[in-house]
């Protein structure tokens, strides 16, 4: 079977191979040394809370398994809106919320909806490897901007300003970040957004690890900066539901 040129551009997701190798190593030494702590994949060691499991059982028993609204179940979107208000103090109307089959699907859909062929999207390097492929699938170009430990491996407003060009469409950020685990300082995130807004660009931010930070200053959603922020969140990490999609 001949694959598309688009598919040929996608690199393997190497972290899964690393995870398999680590699991094999853990099995080999099981019982002979201290248990291993896995730092290679973004997945909790425990499953979803009992209330979530019970809700899934009820849905199956009650026959709630048919097509839903394309934007997601309306009661679910309302509850997500309430959760943002309660947890983060942010007003996000349900009409702004779209439910997808996972955060990767949301990132891909956002890129397809907002990026045209030839558009450039700025993102830090290192960053989540799939992000550049989401942009590429939309016929855009990911512009990787090197970052350092001193910069928390995150972009700054100054770097965004310096890298912005005629073809730049916007930025794709992650806070907290995968794979580095670092967050963007609130003042810096605000400054980045101001630069992007002044350029007429878009700000997409991956917030699927939001709420898992031990530092209060990094526990706020970027959605508080304005209704032109596109935030991607997920049940996978905070609610321990990686395989539930």
How should these model regions be labeled?
Residues 39, 175-178:
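Flexible low-complexity scaffold tracts in large eukaryotic assembly proteins
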Residues 103-107, 127-131, 239:
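Conserved coil-to-alpha-helix start sites within the AMP-binding
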Residues 18, 136, 143, 154-170, ...:
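Active-site pre-lysine segment of PLP-dependent enzymes
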Residues 125, 144-148:
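Short beta->alpha connector loops at strand-helix junctions that form conserved
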Residues 8-102, 109:
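N-terminal small-domain helix-loop-helix segment of the aminotransferase-like
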Residues 243-245:
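Short, intrinsically disordered, charge-balanced linker/junction segments flanking boundaries
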Residues 113-135:
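Conserved PLP-anchoring active-site segment centered on the Schiff-base-forming lysine
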Residues 91-97, 117-120, 167, 227-228:
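Short acidic capping loops at alpha-helix termini that bridge into adjacent secondary structure
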